Amino acid sequence: MPKERLTEELLERLLASSTPEAYLDEGLTIDRRLPDYLFQLLGEKGMKRSEVVRASGLNSTFVYDVFNGDSRLGRDKAIMLALGMGCTLRETQRLLRLDGVSELWAKNRRDAVIIWCVEHGYSRTQTDDELYRLGEKTLLGTGPLR
């Protein structure tokens, strides 16, 4: 699989194009679906779906439906799945985008904690512990609410 170009690089090329068609004719856009990306990540990380289910804390039937394209995750479950797969921050942001939800934003207190946890390789349970410790809603929806 060819290396995917960074969004920033593509944006520069689009803005430098004389017309939208000139950019589109370069064939740089992709039409990727979430299930395709999830299977790509599984292969890259050498994981099985059952391992992702255990590590993410999500319902197995639901996870299998997401991988089949029959269900959408929603933001917190997408983050849980990314943590369960050991995703990098870039992979997590891409997973969130492909699910159609907002990316993690460093200006948001809760998101900042999650970003830090992803960057430091925390598991889903470790991330929930950190969120709880700092008074934020956990990914499982429990914990102190301000």
Each language-model region and where it sits:
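Short, charged recognition helix plus adjacent turn
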Residues: 2-5, 11, 93-122, 141-143
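A short, Lys/Arg-rich alpha-helix, primarily the initiator
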Residues: 16-48, 125-144
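Key DNA-contact positions within bacterial/archaeal DNA-binding proteins
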Residues: 50, 61, 90
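Recognition helix of helix-turn-helix/homeodomain-like DNA-binding domains
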Residues: 57-73, 98-100
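Short, basic-rich loop-to-helix N-cap that marks the start of a DNA-contacting helix
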Residues: 70-83
